[in-house]
Amino acid sequence: VSDDRPITVLHLVANRWWTGSAEPVIRLLLGLRARGHRVLLGLIPGDRFEQKAREAGLEPLADLSLEVRGNPVHALADLRRVRQAIRAEAVDVVHAHHSHDHWLGWLGRGRAGLVRSFHNARAARRDWPSTWLYRRTDALLAVSHEIEERLRRVGVPPARLSRVDGVVDLARFESGDGAAIRAEFALGHAPVLGCVARLAPRRGHELLIRGFQQLLPEYPHARLLLVGKGEARARLEALVSGLGLTREVLFAGYRDADLPAVLQALDAFALMGAGSDESCRAALEAMAAGRPVVGRRVGALPETVVHGVTGLLVDDDRPESVAQALRALVAEPERAAAMGRAGRDRARAFFGPDAHAAQVERVYRRVLAARERAR
């Protein structure tokens, strides 16, 4: 396959929500399209992901359900629809993002190449049907070294594995004004630390809160802004109340349209857990907004944050360690601002839609060249 011929790619995404793989997939499709490729999208219709895809100018395939727990009749109808689309649209590559659509893509691929993205380590399964499928997939993409190593351990040939960086909408997060957010929460000129993450178990909010608490004797005017919604909110609010921090720790709820402004209101960003998207997109958004990042060594954060340059990495789960990192940025605002600028430069260089799409495009061309040689 020539290096300049446009590629037609069918992305299958068994996701209905605006979480996990959803936004990275849309950013990738837009990046591929901007590079001259033709992109098709199959998704679960009727929910937030479809709404966001259409808002981005992407028209999902019709007559496709992708229901993970659908009945066999729906599954067979989906297989027929995928096969028909691959033939009618002359699809070169089928790119799956979840286990369900991975199997569907393998069964319906015909002569097209098959690529699978893994957005979190839990998706890399160890059971024999999954490992059998992985070894018969042309390329597997991991958004972190942790996922890459897990796939190696289950027997995926190294030649089929590729590590790809996360992706962020640079244009959206490089602009914004935090003044309205500071006014909304009466933050004034206080040093403000923030976290954008679902309020759920294993996201590290308790660790962050307890680390922040240790900062307050030296910096009593500091504030912690927790952005997000989720089932753990009541528990976290009870923790904050029990620690006597209801004035210092603020719950901002779920923010979407004004998220860039929220990030601009922060002096530093903190993320203690990776969630369902282990590229840690929230940290990438903070970097694009010019905020320094404090993060635990989870997901792709060790590859995203350059310790001492774009932020600080915490090596363990002790509140004392988190407090030390937060204190370093609050104590030296000029250093924190310089880290934020370096983070923005790094986001522009490596994590924009074009850079991400170029990485994936190289994988596609390698897959197609190998399949051409094998014919």
Predicted regions and their residues:
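Active-site donor-binding acidic/aromatic loop of nucleotide-activated sugar
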Residues: 232-235, 246-255, 262, 312-313
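Short hydrophobic beta-strand element within catalytic cores of glycosyltransferases
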Residues: 42, 292-295, 305
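Short His-centered aromatic/hydrophobic patch
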Residues: 96-102
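A short helix/loop element that forms part of the nucleotide-sugar donor recognition site in Leloir-type
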Residues: 173-187, 259
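A conserved, positively charged/aromatic
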Residues: 113-145
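A conserved mid-protein helix/loop that constitutes part of the nucleotide-sugar donor-binding site
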Residues: 19-30, 191, 195-214, 231-237, ...
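N-terminal strand-loop element at the rim of the active site
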Residues: 6-7, 11-74, 160, 231
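Conserved acidic donor-binding segment of nucleotide-sugar-dependent glycosyltransferases
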Residues: 307-308, 312-319, 328-333
